[in-house]
């Protein structure tokens, strides 16, 4: 008896709760979605260490935006049903997308690209972007609590304040304040805020947005409708962090207002050694202990290769 051969070339394999796509399989899901970004539009969206192409936007981000819009439309239908059931029109509930992942993986770039693409979708939705950096404790507080070496770890965030911010957003409150963080001064900017005024979509980008924990009853992830984890092998993340540190040494660290201005005078080898030590004792440790364990909680995982291009996409079923 001859066995029947089934062509599964274009079918994604199943890995536990995820469907797994290679670049080609994922790119096919773009369908006819138009690319609204140009090379000129793309440049300001990139991080200091990235050279993302329009091909990457077309291949990876357009299918993702198409998927997210399906989810948003379904969410709007549920809100309509609820309003009908309750017999009135209630404040719209913003759709919250979280972007998680390690330091130096390119979360901020992914968040800015998604913001631009979603805002230029035919429905012309209002899309705001907030980073959780603004909810770090002020530098003086971290120093007083001896937490400077734990900056970026869950303990360094004012999590109740972040949760209250998200609760206000989800309740439809107007003009919700988000504190602003300065990477130059390494601190919260006093009396400066971003105002979030009833967006259709809020993108929340940060290291620990998928974090749960043992003591709290409410988590940041409880307010998130769709979560993305930007992933890469640790050896690559370490390399990217060191490369970024060297670029900052030649640029931002030279600013007299920079918290890290003392690094500007380091030799290249001393700078590499310093960055390696920071990675091994802080960022790499945070990745292993707090960030990486949350990866499987995401709705979608983007796994990057050596050139920052996404090689594999995992989508929760």
Curated annotation (Swiss-Prot):
Gene3D superfamilies: P-loop containing nucleotide triphosphate hydrolases. The keyword Nucleotide-binding applies. ATP binds at residues 101-108. One of its GO terms (cellular component) is cytoplasm. GO terms for biological process: coenzyme A biosynthetic process. Keywords: ATP-binding, Coenzyme A biosynthesis, Cytoplasm, Kinase, Nucleotide-binding, Transferase. It is an enzyme of class 2 (transferase). Coiled coil: none annotated. Its EC number is 2.7.1.33. It catalyses: (R)-pantothenate + ATP = (R)-4'-phosphopantothenate + ADP + H(+). One of its GO terms (molecular function) is pantothenate kinase activity. It is found in: Cytoplasm. HAMAP family: Pantothen_kinase_1 (MF_00215). Belongs to the prokaryotic pantothenate kinase family. This is Pantothenate kinase. It comes from Actinobacillus succinogenes (strain ATCC 55618 / DSM 22257 / CCUG 43843 / 130Z).
């Amino acid at each position: 008896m001859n066995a029947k051969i089934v062509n599964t070339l274009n079918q994604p394999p199943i890995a536990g709760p995820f469907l797994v796509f290679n670049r080609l399989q994922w790119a096919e899901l773009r369908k006819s979605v138009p690319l609204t970004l140009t090379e000129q539009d793309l440049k300001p969206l990139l991080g200091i260490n990235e050279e993302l192409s329009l091909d990457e936007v077309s291949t990876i981000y357009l299918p993702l935006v198409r998927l997210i819009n399906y989810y948003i439309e379904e969410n709007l239908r549920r809100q309509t049903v609820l309003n009908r059931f309750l017999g009135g029109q209630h404040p719209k509930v913003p759709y919250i997308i979280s972007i998680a992942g390690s330091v130096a993986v390119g979360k901020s770039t992914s968040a800015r690209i998604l913001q631009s693409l979603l805002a230029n979708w035919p429905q012309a939705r209002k899309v705001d972007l907030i980073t959780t950096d603004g909810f770090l404790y002020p530098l003086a507080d971290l120093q007083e609590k001896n937490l400077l070496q734990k900056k970026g770890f869950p303990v360094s965030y004012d999590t109740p304040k972040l949760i209250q911010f998200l609760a206000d957003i989800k309740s439809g409150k107007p003009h919700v304040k988000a504190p602003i963080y300065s990477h130059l001064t390494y601190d919260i900017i006093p009396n400066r805020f971003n105002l979030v005024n009833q967006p259709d979509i809020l993108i929340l980008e940060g290291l620990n947005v998928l974090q749960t924990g043992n003591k709290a009853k409410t988590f940041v992830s409880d307010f998130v409708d769709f979560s993305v984890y930007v992933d890469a092998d640790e050896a690559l993340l370490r390399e990217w962090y060191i490369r970024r540190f060297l670029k900052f040494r030649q640029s931002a660290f030279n600013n007299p207002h920079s918290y890290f201005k003392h690094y500007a005078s380091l030799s290249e080898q001393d700078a590499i050694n310093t960055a390696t030590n920071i990675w091994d004792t802080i960022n790499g440790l945070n990745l292993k202990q707090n960030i990486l364990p949350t990866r499987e909680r995401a709705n979608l995982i983007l796994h990057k290769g050596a050139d920052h291009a996404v090689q594999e996409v995992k989508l929760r079923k």
